[in-house]
């Protein structure tokens, strides 16, 4: 494998055995591709905005005299960039401008004569744009639109599994679900009649729909039944015989023909009898007259002489009727063929319960069901029915729905109309009846072929269409009002409904979520999440067990592990690593094609529907060098079952062992040794890890760390290769390679880094360069690390030396004992940034003012404020300190004579204002790192605001001029090269000022042209610089668009440093979580023979019952990795020659049975080997991919190479006594995470505070500054102890005895420590509740 210069800095040893056929795809493509489809112009108009416009336009007036046509649209440029939007709290969006054409036709002239055409570009609101990382900035916060897994449009056949009716009879039903429009359901009732429901309303007999489609009873029976023909010959009844229909029947008379008896009366007719009848070619048999009684006629029979109806279609025949028919000359009688086995009389029975008999009555019946209480008219009933399923405006199956519909009905074509046809409805009824008759299967709703993904683009398009439809109504009204000659398209369109619909979706839809930004993994997982909840989806309460369960079709599409615990389990899932959506929105996963028993590298993506037809081998099947399967029988999956198949039956093979799991689960090493429940917790807890001060790569990883770190977008990645020309903490400049430059550009890439900004979860986002001056970089190399990344690899926690042993009860029940060294070295110290805002409003009594002049506040409290009343940057503040001084005018108060006197003497003291300053919340302390002041347009800016503006301007000017200098330097170096190559002497050239170089004339015409081109570029550069500077200045100095009534907002950012402490929650990656019980002095920790103490002591009892053995293997492998690092460290310290170092590191990389990774250190220069060794000092990082990881033997070999015991256990000594522990202890390195459940955020105390309105009891919870709940169990405990007075105090003065608690407060103030309990308020509430039941309870004084 070829490594770039940057990748050579640290190479992770990979234990994976299977070759990597397919690289991990870009992990955010589900979001980015979907939104791209929404906003890019699609010439076919199938997707996105184009499709929405085409479906609504052209809009015609009611009279048809004019129409508004759509021509094209374009998206403008956003006003602010992403960072500016976040700071200002606005939405990152672009204006949508649509070109519309108003066409007015001549009234009197023949149709289509155009009178006037006006075209104009119309503004249609703002469309939020997606950032490069797949998020949206809405009102200044980053949000993610989660994809939804919903039931695909189409037709579904299902049964109630015998649960509806008490008899346990299985009732079948069919449901046609459109993409938009009314649902159509067909269902059987326990009596086997077929009913129809529209939009899940009251049910009607299903034949009503057929009558409404203009079918007569005869035609209906003709559609659904085969016929049996009887003929009356010579006063005998002959029946036309189709032998196959007799199978399984019992003969009720002798079946004979030509004097030969085929079946005797009472015998069962078997296949042998049928073969005999077919062989002899028997077409008719004679039947007794009674046999026809009870049969059902298939058409109307009329007496032709009188015109009288003898027998209507669907009537049962009797012997009387037969006689009548025979008399009136009907010698041939057609009846319906039915039997109990596979030709039920369902439709015939349904026609009997159908109250309607013609089209109109059917339409009226449907109208009454849809619009109860409204008087039906013929026109209303007809238009209602037409609009339900046959109007393109109201009904759309969509391409997906039509494809699924036709596939379900086994039709050949998959394309077709978006509305239903007569045939569609009849075919669905036929298939439902076939299923009831025992032919065909019902569908599995949880199959991923019946559930599809709706991503951002599609949901945004639907919302946009909703807005457009609202506009359409208004435009229609406007077009009909006449007076069109003076109107332009602009006057008809009101953009409000559109922007409101879009805004509502992005701002408050259930699927538009506040981004989980704890660390890069939680961002990526959030964007790859798939939810079954949301509009048009399921609800938590109604979702049953089946929907939540893992389905065989989830394989390679949806992760079976990563899902929340709790009420949402199984409803919220995560996309598997390689999964993607196809054009219809179904999830598909890649497989390697197998041709004639040879596995090729050809990749096919299969959806769940297609996968059912193939036999698919697992990724860990053994192959020889040619790609043949080694074993004769291979474990494969087929139709959702797993079994053994011979190798020539195999069609496909999995691409990778980690194909099954999601990104989160693929980061857990030795996942294959963990119990599924614990793996679920491990995957979920990695997302809660807080980025530590110094990121530390995991010693034991899975090889996915780099992909996650790069794709998450928190790192700075090189867009093009080149050399590092300049680097400091906030900027990296790359001089681009010649071959990657665009013609006519300076060839300089500038990367500005993010410094100490706040994330959504208040953690700290900070980027640090990881390249040095002069280093070569290639496209895709990581230039700067973000939060939780280390040299371009995801690093969520720290590698800790752990021992599994009990330690004096301090690790009872998952508690964790931590060494003080961890605190001293700041291993788990995290930085949290809080944003506190102070809003100055315009009140009825006058404006609030931000000032340092606050009444009744001492000098000390104001010491950290400047003259504008805003805290200085860099000030250390603690709970209760004033950050922004603010006063609010208060109403005129009646003054006492004394106050009047004082006022008269000392002049007007500011007593008509009250202090409403922004203070630091209790329990928070930190450093002010930034202050932002936003002032409304037209309000005078204070001194601080002007200072900040000046600073920003300076910074912007500095940034831009530095950029200009860098670009100029690049340009002039190219100009110099042209001049020198044309023969100008370099020394003379360097003496000339650079500006004069461009004035030189060259004899060589080609070179002169080049020089002129470069001169042009130089002018353009300067012009661009002026333009950018002016734009920046305008942005900085313009007023801010604040909410109504707000004059000023001051935002203060506090950085809080949190060290690890008892009560913080920590976890490994295997679901092994615990709370820190004690920080132990270093000297008391257990230590080994070399005197090295352990960092963390974990309880060994946490392993066996939880079955997450992966943590033990990780610990052993971590120990080996560290051992090798220690040996490298020793060699570096002894300054051994590079050859020895190279040989040892090469041995470590080569270790392991047939591993895929080939590292050849002989191609590395000595410097590169030394730098690699330097990065391996703290341990050699190892990758053990999921389901393809290091084997036990390999771990032992690695331990041996690091001169460590192969058991992984060592002798430890007690730090307090120095005695040896009685048995060897498992010690090694485990990757531990600090989770975002910090004791500082949970610790809370209250003396007095707010009370609930009704019960007058203290509120609950830290956010409400609530009290501790003393619940019923706690009451029982005090009762059990007989602590009567304590209990009385708890239930009265400490809770809701209003008078008692005020008295008690007064007593304490007076120094009199006595209490008189009174009546608890909740007792009064109880009395009122009993009275509300009509029972009057009076309290009497004794």
Curated annotation (Swiss-Prot):
It catalyses: RNA(n) + a ribonucleoside 5'-triphosphate = RNA(n+1) + diphosphate. InterPro entries: DNA-dir_RNA_pol_bsu_ext_1_sf, DNA-dir_RNA_pol_bsu_external_1, DNA-dir_RNA_pol_su2, DNA-dir_RNAP_su2_dom, DNA-dir_RNAP_su2_hyb_sf, RNA_pol_bsu_bac, RNA_pol_bsu_CS, RNA_pol_bsu_protrusion. One of its GO terms (molecular function) is DNA-directed RNA polymerase activity. SUPFAM superfamilies: beta and beta-prime subunits of DNA dependent RNA-polymerase (SSF64484). GO terms for biological process: DNA-templated transcription. It comes from the Bacteria. The keyword Transmembrane does not apply. Gene3D superfamilies: 2.40.50.100, 2.40.50.150, 3.90.1100.10, 6.10.140.1670, DNA-directed RNA polymerase, beta subunit, external 1 domain (2.30.150.10), DNA-directed RNA polymerase, subunit 2, domain 6 (2.40.270.10), RNA polymerase alpha subunit dimerisation domain (3.90.1800.10), RNA polymerase Rpb2, domain 2 (3.90.1110.10). Its EC number is 2.7.7.6. GO terms for cellular component: DNA-directed RNA polymerase complex. Keywords: DNA-directed RNA polymerase, Nucleotidyltransferase, Transcription, Transferase. DNA-dependent RNA polymerase catalyzes the transcription of DNA into RNA using the four ribonucleoside triphosphates as substrates. The RNAP catalytic core consists of 2 alpha, 1 beta, 1 beta' and 1 omega subunit. When a sigma factor is associated with the core the holoenzyme is formed, which can initiate transcription. Belongs to the RNA polymerase beta chain family. This is DNA-directed RNA polymerase subunit beta. The gene is rpoB.
